[in-house]
Amino acid sequence: MIICKTERELEIMREAGRIVALTHQEIKLHIQPGITTKKLDEIAETFIRSHGATPSFKGYNGFTGSICASVNEELVHGIPGNRVLKEGDIISVDIGAKYNGYHGDSAWTYAVGNISDEDQDLLDVTETSLYKGLEQAKAGARLSDISHAIQSYAEPRGYAIVREYVGHGVGQNLHEDPQIPHYGPPGKGPRLKPGMVLAIEPMVNAGSRYVRTLSDNWTVVTVDGKKCAHFEHTIAITETGYEILTKA
C-alpha cells in the first residue's frame, strides 16, 4: 500500500533528509586516500546522532554499519571495515537517518583523489540519469515514467542499469511501497500523487548489468568486476512537481 504523507509528516521528513544531506557533506570532507571505510562509518554515525537522529541502516536485518560503503566494483550494501581507500578509487556511500520516527535516504558516489576520465564519465552519467528520472516525478505521471527516463539516458551512453535493486517508498519504514525499477517502458504503474515520498536510486554498471552477492550476504558486486555507481535522493511528489527532501 502506498502511503501519502501529511504536511506534518513531510516537515519531519524534510529534517530527516536535511540530516542525511549534511552527513554526506561531512563524509565528503574525509573521503581521501588512506582512510578506512570503518572510519567513514564512525564519522557518519557520530554526526547523525549529534543531530538528534539515529542511523537507519545500523541493525537493519542485522547490518552492522551505520552507512553502506561500496568501493569500485561493489555496487551496494558494502559493510564498512578495514578496507583502505586508494587514489583513483570510487566509493558509493549510502546514508539513512531516522528522525522523530521517519527516515531519509540518499546515496552518492564519490571520487577518491584523482580518478580516470572513464570513471568520471560513469559518475556523471549516473548522476544525470537520476535527475532525468526526477524530471518525470510529478502528480498525474505514471511511476514507470521515472524508470524509463533513467534507462533512456544511461543505456544509450554505453552503460547498464542494474535490474535486481530498485527504488522505493520511504516513511516510517525505510522501505515502503511502491518499488521503483530504474528501467522499463513508460506509462505503467500507479499514478503519482501529492504526498508520495519516493527514493529514486539508479545503480549503473560500466560493464554488464549482472551482479552477485558476496559470502558476507550483504555486499553486491558486478559479476565482471567493472566499476559501478549509485546516486539516490528521497523526494516528495507535490502539486507542481517534486521536492528533494535529502538536501541541506
From Swiss-Prot:
Key words of the record: Aminopeptidase, Hydrolase, Metal-binding, Protease
Hydrolase as UniProt keyword: yes
Catalysis: reaction(s): Release of N-terminal amino acids, preferentially methionine, from peptides and arylamides
A cellular component term, taken from the record's GO annotations: cytosol
SUPFAM superfamilies on file: Creatinase/aminopeptidase
Lineage: superkingdom: Bacteria
InterPro entries: Creatinase/aminopeptidase-like, Pept_M24, Pept_M24_MAP, Pept_M24A_MAP1
Cofactor comment: Binds 2 divalent metal cations per subunit. Has a high-affinity and a low affinity metal-binding site. The true nature of the physiological cofactor is under debate. The enzyme is active with cobalt, zinc, manganese or divalent iron ions. Most likely, methionine aminopeptidases function as mononuclear Fe(2+)-metalloproteases under physiological conditions, and the catalytically relevant metal-binding site has been assigned to the histidine-containing high-affinity site.
Nuclease is among the record's keywords: no
Cofactor: Co(2+); Zn(2+); Mn(2+); Fe(2+)
EC number: 3.4.11.18
Function in brief: Removes the N-terminal methionine from nascent proteins. The N-terminal methionine is often cleaved when the second residue in the primary sequence is small and uncharged (Met-Ala-, Cys, Gly, Pro, Ser, Thr, or Val). Requires deformylation of the N(alpha)-formylated initiator methionine before it can be hydrolyzed.
Similarity annotation: Belongs to the peptidase M24A family. Methionine aminopeptidase type 1 subfamily.
HAMAP family assigned: MetAP_1
PANTHER family per UniProt: METHIONINE AMINOPEPTIDASE
Record's subunit section: Monomer.
Name listed for the protein in its UniProt record: Methionine aminopeptidase
